[in-house]
């Protein structure tokens, strides 16, 4: 284990649930995080901000929080700002990194300006003429395309579009979830990877091979036929290079401590970064525990390591 006296952490809230589209995932993550912290002797308690006012954290003597909320106010900087106000230390990125990390549109703008490779894309606003925009976008980017709300996680409302005719309906559906919709050129030929970031841990890349078209919500949290390849199949030099770029992609957004950076490789082996996740899932299907397990770090040790970053 970490060798840290559990009493140093004081009373810890595991933030879970919330009211985003990812509530059920967060509840699952939070329950496991809670058990992992308790297994290490830490005084940890569940706290669902959808059911209790945040002021109760201060009133009840919590001194730090493990943020297992996903999406919405749990990941967009709002919870982080409130915790800063109450003087409660918390896991993960601060206000700026959280806000940028959840916003795929502004993430891509920052990456374009800082030399992080990311797929070509267009944006569509809720209420636009979807048929007209679809025609313009296909002319610029071709097909296949990925359509996704700018600020949802866990692949909520993400659709792979293979024909121009299917694009208007996909735009309309995604716009129900966010006023900004990202339409991204699909990067084909080299596979999907994730880089898990956790303080100074050197975690391996994971190659993700879903049984279906792409790594959607079902593949992430329900299916048992998604393959997670560790080692990922890249040579050591390439893996080290892509981990370095992933860390920079994380850092230029102001993200800190821990999270994930997801990317695709094209047929020539060039990386294209898709998004970061500043509050990654911690369910039994989730990627950070898998990466940690591959280098001999158990679940409880991982969550204690993440929480220990709040002691600095």
Curated annotation (Swiss-Prot):
Binding residues annotated for ATP, in chain numbering: 138-193
Gene Ontology cellular-component terms listed: cytosol
Major site of localization recorded for this protein: cytoplasm
EC code(s) of this entry: 6.3.2.4
Any one GO molecular-function label of the UniProt entry: ATP binding
Keyword field: ATP-binding, Cell shape, Cell wall biogenesis/degradation, Cytoplasm, Ligase, Magnesium, Manganese, Metal-binding, Nucleotide-binding, Peptidoglycan synthesis
Cofactor dependence: Mg(2+); Mn(2+)
Binding site for Mg(2+) 1: 262, 275
GO BP: any one term: regulation of cell shape
Positions contributing to Mg(2+) 2 binding: 275, 277
Note describing how the cofactor binds: Binds 2 magnesium or manganese ions per subunit.
Pathway info: Cell wall biogenesis; peptidoglycan biosynthesis
Subcellular localization, as worded in the UniProt entry: Cytoplasm
The reaction(s) this protein catalyses: 2 D-alanine + ATP = D-alanyl-D-alanine + ADP + phosphate + H(+)
Span of domain ATP-grasp: 108-308
Pfam family, one: Dala_Dala_lig_C
Function statement: Cell wall formation.
Family designation: Belongs to the D-alanine--D-alanine ligase family.
Protein name (Swiss-Prot/TrEMBL): D-alanine--D-alanine ligase
């Amino acid at each position: 284990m970490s060798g840290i006296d559990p009493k140093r952490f004081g009373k810890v809230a595991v933030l879970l649930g919330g009211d985003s589209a990812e509530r059920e995932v967060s509840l699952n993550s939070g329950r496991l995080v809670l058990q992992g912290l308790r297994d290490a002797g830490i005084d940890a308690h569940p706290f669902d901000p959808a059911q209790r006012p945040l002021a109760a954290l201060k009133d009840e003597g919590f001194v730090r929080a493990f943020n297992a909320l996903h999406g919405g106010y749990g990941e967009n900087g709002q919870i982080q700002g409130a915790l800063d106000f109450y003087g409660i230390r918390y896991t993960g990125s601060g206000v700026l990194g959280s806000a940028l990390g959840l916003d795929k549109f502004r993430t891509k703008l920052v990456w374009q300006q800082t030399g992080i490779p990311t797929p070509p894309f267009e944006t569509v606003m809720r209420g636009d003429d979807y048929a007209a925009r679809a025609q313009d976008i296909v002319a610029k980017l071709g097909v296949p395309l990925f359509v996704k709300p700018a600020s949802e996680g866990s692949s909520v409302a993400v659709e792979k579009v293979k024909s121009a005719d299917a694009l208007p309906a996909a735009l309309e559906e995604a716009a129900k979830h966010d006023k900004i919709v990202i339409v991204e050129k699909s990067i084909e030929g080299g596979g999907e990877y994730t880089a898990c970031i956790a303080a100074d841990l050197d975690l391996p890349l994971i190659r993700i091979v879903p049984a279906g078209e792409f790594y959607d919500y079902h593949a992430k949290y329900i299916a048992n036929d998604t393959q997670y390849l560790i080692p990922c199949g890249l040579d050591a030099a390439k893996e080290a290079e892509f981990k370095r770029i992933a860390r920079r992609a994380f850092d230029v957004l102001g993200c800190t401590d821990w999270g994930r950076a997801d990317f695709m490789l094209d047929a020539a082996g060039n990386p294209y970064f898709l998004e970061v996740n500043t509050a990654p899932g911690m369910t039994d299907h989730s990627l950070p525990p898998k990466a940690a397990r591959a280098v001999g770090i158990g679940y409880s040790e991982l969550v204690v390591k993440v929480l220990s970053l709040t002691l600095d």
